[in-house]
């Protein structure tokens, strides 16, 4: 499943009271453009998912064809969800024949179907949540100068993050946005043609860890073994030891009961010593995600919002 589809599911699953950035469409034919409003100060999805806006300059004295470009690299990086074990799609044929006259040929349609355990990586760059670039030699501004001043006027601050001048929202709003995202992950829904293919889309297994850098060392924990999805507790244990200097808290495993059969109980036994040392937490995905969201919202992990470099 494409990363774009996964991001669409997350965006569509945001709480009903969370406003999303309006989409603007302009131009005609081959010169059409579509982009969001580009206001990460106002909209959580512009902040976390990023955007790019390139429009013709309307400033007095602007040269013909000159454009204004504002861009925000994604704060939430997502990978393509790929089947852990090779799975061959099959063709499903359907017909539409309701109210057709007797002897009339039905309308035939087909689509591909598959069942698979899909896995992918995800990275949330916490120091950049609610932090917007205003300029730099090699960095496009996320906000024009006037809006940057507006952020500061509403309680924001000016900072330098990774050698780039930025404005930053108050910590309370930054905490809230991360908490909303985590709770959305716990109840994500989506998929096409749900009238016929409705099903649970919430994660069966999540591995969460606060890492000081941007490397995910746990991509090989869930793998194929004997043509089945396998959780390798030995790999997890060795990666935790190898990356101990980069980990800034326990590794949290959210694992739905019944997913992968008895492997959940076996992993709990294999990792019992790490759980006793509070280096690993094991629970239901919804419980793990919601608990972490509450901890972040209450300010228990504010140090994660500061760049460690």
Q: Can you annotate each of these PLM segments?
A:
Residues 1-309:
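RNA-binding basic/glycine-rich loop and surface signature characteristic of RAMP-family CRISPR effectors
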């Amino acid at each position: 499943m494409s990363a774009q589809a996964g991001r669409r599911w997350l965006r569509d699953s945001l709480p009903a009271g969370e406003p999303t950035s309006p989409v603007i469409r302009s131009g005609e034919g081959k010169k059409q453009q579509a982009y969001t409003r580009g206001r990460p100060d106002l909209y959580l999805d512009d902040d976390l998912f990023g955007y790019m806006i390139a429009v013709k300059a309307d400033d007095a004295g602007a040269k013909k064809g000159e454009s204004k470009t504002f861009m925000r690299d994604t704060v939430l990086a997502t990978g393509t969800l790929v089947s852990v074990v090779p799975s061959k799609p099959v063709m499903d044929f359907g017909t539409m024949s309701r109210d057709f006259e007797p002897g009339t040929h039905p309308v035939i349609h087909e689509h591909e179907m598959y069942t698979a355990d899909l896995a992918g990586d995800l990275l949330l760059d916490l120091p950049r949540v609610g932090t917007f670039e205003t300029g730099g030699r090699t960095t496009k501004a996320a906000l024009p100068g006037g809006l940057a001043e507006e952020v500061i006027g509403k309680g924001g601050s000016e900072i330098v993050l990774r050698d780039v001048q930025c404005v930053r929202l108050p910590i309370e709003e930054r905490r809230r946005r991360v908490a909303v995202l985590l709770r959305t992950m716990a109840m994500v829904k989506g998929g096409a043609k749900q009238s016929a293919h409705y099903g649970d889309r919430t994660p069966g297994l999540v591995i969460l860890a606060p890492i000081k850098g941007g490397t995910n060392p746990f991509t090989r924990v869930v793998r194929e073994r004997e043509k089945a999805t396998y959780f390798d507790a030995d790999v997890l244990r060795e990666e935790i030891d190898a990356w101990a200097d980069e980990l800034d808290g326990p590794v949290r495993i959210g694992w739905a009961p019944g997913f992968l059969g008895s492997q959940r109980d076996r992993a709990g036994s294999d990792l019992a010593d790490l759980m006793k040392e509070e280096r690993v937490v094991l629970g239901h995905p919804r419980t793990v995600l919601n608990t972490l969201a509450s901890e972040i919202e209450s300010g228990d992990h504010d140090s994660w919002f500061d760049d460690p470099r």
